[in-house]
C-alpha cells in the first residue's frame, strides 16, 4: 500500500488522477456536543436558568446520548474592578460563576464560557448591553484565562470577534494566537477553544482551536440552514485531526418543519460540525428531542476518523456527499443525498463513484432501519428541503480514479477576503464536479494539495490535469516532496 501527497501550483485547476494511500488516525477529540444559551436567550440568562438547562440535559437523556457541554454564552458580564478583574452581573449571577461551573460538573457535564477577542462583547453591540463594554479579552488575556479556567473551572471557551473589529485594527491570526498562548501559559488543562469569526478564518485556525465558525449566525429559518450548509460544502479538506468546521449552534426545536430539522441535524452530523443545542431543553418538542438523540446520526458525527463529508455529485440542484466511517479506505461509507431546492430532486449515482463495489448493504440512519442491498447504483427521489443519510457497507472498496480540485487543501485559503488575489472555490457549469479553484499560484505557498491520494499497490501512474486558464500557464507538480517535470501547458 502506498500513500502520496501531491501538490500543484497553477491558476485554475479542475481535477487530477494519481495515486497514494493513508494511515489511520487514533484518539482524536470528536466534535463538541452539548447545549449553549445564545440562540434562545441571547444576553438574558441567569444562574437558575443555566442550572435548569443542565438538569434537563440529564433528565431528557441527552447526557446519556453524548451531549456533555453546558455553555454560558454572552450576558454574564458585570464590570472590571480596580485591578481589572472581571465581575459577574450582580442580578443575573449574584453568586458568581464558579458555583455555576461546579453545578454543571456535579452533573457529570463540562462547562463552557464566552468572551470576545476585543474589548467589547457582541451583546454590547447587537443587544445594547452596557455590561458588555470593556469586558473582552483585549489587554486582559492571562488575567481572564486564569479566572475562567483556574478559579471558575470552565473547560471550553467561545471567542467572538465583535469588539476586535470595532477600531482596534486587529489581525485575526495574530489575535487568536495571542489568546491561545495566554490560555496555555496559565492553564495546564486542555481547554477547548472555538474561534467565532463568522467565516472560515484560514488554515492557521487548526493550530489554535478545536473548531471555528464558517458563517454568519444561524437563525431558525430554512434559508439560514441552507446558507450555512452551502458555506461548508467545499471545506472538507480543512476538517480533521480533531479540528472541525463549526456550522453554528443547532436550531432544532425552534420552529423548523420536521423534514428541515432532519436536514439540519443530519448535515451537521455528516459534516462533523460541533453539535450544540440552542433551544429550551425543558420545553423541547418530543420529535425534536428524539432526533437529537438519534444514536446512529450521533455516531456518524462522533466517528473516530473525524472526517467531514465531501461532495461527489452535484446535479439537478441536489448534492451527494460521502465520507469514510470506522476505518479509512475501509468498506463502510456514509452518504448523504441532500435536496436544498424548492422542488423534487432526482438522484442517481453509480456505486463506483462512491468507491464501493459488489453487493452493498444499505441502512437509513435517520429512520434507523436497514433498507436492503444494492449493486450498481443508488437512485432516489427526494422532496424539497430534505435529506437521506445512509450507511453503506460494501463487499469491495474500489480505488479512486480522480480527485477534484474542490477536495484539495489550499494553504492560503480563507473566507475573510484577505487571501492572495481572492483565491476561492467557484462554480463552473462544465467542470467535472461543477466547481473550480481560482487564482492559484503567484507565490510559492499558494498551491493545491491532495494529502491522501490512494493506490493499493503503488507504482508509476500517468497524471492528467484538467484546467481552464485564460492563457497558457506554467504548472509545477510535486509528489511526496519530489518535483516532476515542469512544462508550460496549453488550455484544456
Question: Each predicted region: which residue ranges?
Answer:
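Carbohydrate-binding surface patches
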Residues: 268-271, 276-278, 314-356, 385, ...
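Catalytic cores of secreted or luminal carbohydrate-active enzymes
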Residues: 266-312, 384-411
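Glycan-recognition surfaces
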Residues: 140, 174, 186, 190-280
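Structural recognition of the beta-strand scaffold that forms the well-ordered cores
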Residues: 27, 31-37, 66-73, 110-115, ...
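Extracytoplasmic
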Residues: 345, 354-362, 370-492
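Glycan-recognition and catalytic regions of carbohydrate-active enzymes
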Residues: 276-341, 420-437, 441
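Aromatic-lined carbohydrate-binding/catalytic grooves of carbohydrate-active enzymes
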Residues: 49, 53, 57-166
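Bacterial Sec-dependent N-terminal signal peptides
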Residues: 1-24
Amino acid at each position: 500500500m502506498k500513500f502520496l501527497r501531491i501538490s500543484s501550483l497553477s491558476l485554475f485547476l479542475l481535477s487530477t488522477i494519481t495515486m497514494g494511500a493513508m494511515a489511520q488516525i487514533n484518539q482524536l477529540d470528536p466534535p463538541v456536543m452539548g447545549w449553549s444559551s445564545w440562540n434562545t436567550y441571547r444576553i438574558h440568562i441567569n444562574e437558575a436558568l443555566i442550572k435548569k438547562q443542565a438538569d434537563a440535559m440529564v433528565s431528557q437523556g441527552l447526557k446519556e446520548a453524548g451531549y456533555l457541554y453546558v455553555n454560558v454564552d454572552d450576558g454574564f458580564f458585570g464590570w472590571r474592578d480596580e485591578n481589572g478583574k472581571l465581575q459577574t452581573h450582580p442580578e443575573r449571577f449574584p453568586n458568581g460563576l464558579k458555583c455555576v461551573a461546579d453545578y454543571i460538573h456535579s452533573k457529570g457535564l463540562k462547562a463552557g464560557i464566552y468572551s470576545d477577542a476585543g474589548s467589547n462583547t457582541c451583546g454590547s453591540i447587537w443587544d445594547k448591553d452596557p455590561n458588555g463594554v470593556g469586558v473582552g479579552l483585549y489587554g486582559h488575556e492571562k488575567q481572564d484565562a486564569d479566572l475562567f479556567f483556574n478559579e471558575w473551572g470552565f473547560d471550553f471557551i467561545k471567542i467572538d470577534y465583535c469588539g476586535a473589529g470595532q477600531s482596534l485594527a486587529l489581525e485575526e491570526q495574530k489575535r487568536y494566537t495571542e489568546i491561545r498562548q495566554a490560555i496555555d501559559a496559565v492553564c495546564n488543562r486542555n481547554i477547548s477553544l472555538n474561534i467565532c469569526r463568522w467565516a472560515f478564518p484560514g488554515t492557521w485556525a487548526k493550530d489554535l482551536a478545536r473548531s471555528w465558525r464558517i458563517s454568519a449566525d444561524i437563525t431558525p429559518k430554512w434559508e439560514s440552514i441552507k446558507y450555512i450548509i452551502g458555506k461548508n460544502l467545499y471545506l472538507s479538506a480543512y476538517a480533521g485531526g480533531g479540528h472541525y468546521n463549526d456550522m453554528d449552534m443547532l436550531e432544532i426545536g425552534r420552529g423548523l418543519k420536521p423534514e428541515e430539522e432532519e436536514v439540519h441535524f443530519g448535515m451537521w452530523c455528516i459534516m462533523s460540525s460541533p453539535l450544540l443545542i440552542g433551544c429550551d431543553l425543558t420545553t423541547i418538542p418530543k420529535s425534536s428531542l428524539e432526533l437529537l438523540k438519534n444514536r446512529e446520526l450521533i455516531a456518524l458525527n462522533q466517528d473516530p476518523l473525524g472526517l467531514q463529508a465531501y461532495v461527489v455529485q452535484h446535479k439537478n440542484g441536489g448534492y451527494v456527499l460521502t465520507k469514510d466511517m470506522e476505518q479509512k479506505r475501509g468498506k463502510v461509507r456514509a452518504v448523504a443525498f441532500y435536496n436544498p431546492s424548492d422542488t423534487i430532486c432526482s438522484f442517481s449515482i453509480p456505486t463506483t463513484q462512491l468507491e464501493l463495489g459488489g453487493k452493498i448493504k444499505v441502512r437509513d440512519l435517520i429512520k434507523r432501519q436497514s433498507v436492503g442491498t444494492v449493486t450498481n447504483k443508488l437512485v432516489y427521489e427526494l422532496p424539497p428541503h430534505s435529506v437521506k443519510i445512509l450507511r453503506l457497507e460494501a463487499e469491495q472498496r474500489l480505488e479512486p480514479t480522480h480527485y477534484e480540485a474542490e477536495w484539495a487543501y489550499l494553504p492560503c485559503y480563507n473566507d475573510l477576503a484577505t487571501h492572495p488575489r481572492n483565491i476561492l472555490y467557484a462554480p463552473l457549469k462544465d467542470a467535472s464536479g461543477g466547481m473550480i479553484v481560482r487564482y492559484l499560484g503567484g507565490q510559492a505557498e499558494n498551491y493545491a494539495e491532495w494529502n491522501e491520494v490512494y493506490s493499493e499497490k503503488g507504482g508509476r501512474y500517468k497524471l492528467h490535469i484538467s484546467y481552464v486558464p485564460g492563457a497558457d500557464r506554467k504548472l509545477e507538480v510535486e509528489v511526496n516532496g519530489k518535483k516532476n517535470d515542469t512544462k508550460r501547458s496549453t488550455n484544456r
